[in-house]
Amino acid sequence: MDAIVKNFPVLDDTSGRPTQKEAEEAVRVLLRWAGEDPAREGLKDTPARVAKAYREIFGGYDLAAEDVLGRTFEEVSGYDDIVLEKDIPFYSHCEHHMVPIIGKAHIAYLPNGRVLGLSKIARVVDIYARRLQTQEAMTAQIARAIDETLVPRGVAVMIEAEHLCMAMRGIKKQGATTMTTTFTGEFKSEPAEQVRFMTMLRGFK
């Protein structure tokens, strides 16, 4: 898993990030390249809008999963079985063509003395989704963040998504779904735990 996981640093003011003005000018260049006139009425404000939208869409680069996962809770009444959150919706962008990836994540872990607030898992998905991604890398990144921060007995992550780079261009196969999984700890070493994870997913349909 280490080979695929990318460690994105939290950016600061010294990172060399272009300014808002430079980002807007880059959009104007793309508009001209596409054959458009960025000065026409309908496009005059587009560069600023695109730069603002991209700041939000790619806001995950400014966030660290470890900060979100830093606060945990003692297990309630000694609960130590699977904790599963399924159907967590997300959108991301393909790092190859910068077009959307739309999907949902299913995440489970086996507690080892501590549990996460339920919203924290969804926030971690959001952090990694709001970056340029491959689905394989995102799956591994989520699993690693939870595994290293919470140190549970095991983590299971499944992502299913439609890649618009495959639907809008190239082979143009709309509706095709890609599924990826990553398992750590007991989910990786104990096939029965993987079966339980998959059974719980199917049972909640």
From Swiss-Prot:
Tree of life domain: Bacteria
A GO biological-process term: tetrahydrobiopterin biosynthetic process
EC number: 3.5.4.16
HAMAP family, alphabetized: FolE (MF_00223)
Classification of source organism: Bacteria, Pseudomonadati, Pseudomonadota, Alphaproteobacteria, Hyphomicrobiales
Family label: Belongs to the GTP cyclohydrolase I family.
PROSITE patterns documented for this protein: GTP_CYCLOHYDROL_1_1, GTP_CYCLOHYDROL_1_2
Protein name, per record: GTP cyclohydrolase 1
Gene Ontology cellular component annotations, sorted alphabetically: cytoplasm
Associated pathway: Cofactor biosynthesis; 7,8-dihydroneopterin triphosphate biosynthesis; 7,8-dihydroneopterin triphosphate from GTP: step 1/1
Subunit field text: Toroid-shaped homodecamer, composed of two pentamers of five dimers.
GO molecular function per UniProt: GTP binding; GTP cyclohydrolase I activity; zinc ion binding
Keywords: GTP-binding, Hydrolase, Metal-binding, Nucleotide-binding, One-carbon metabolism, Zinc
Gene name per UniProt: folE
Catalytic function, reaction form: GTP + H2O = 7,8-dihydroneopterin 3'-triphosphate + formate + H(+)
SUPFAM superfamilies: Tetrahydrobiopterin biosynthesis enzymes-like
Residues the entry annotates as binding Zn(2+): 94, 97, 165
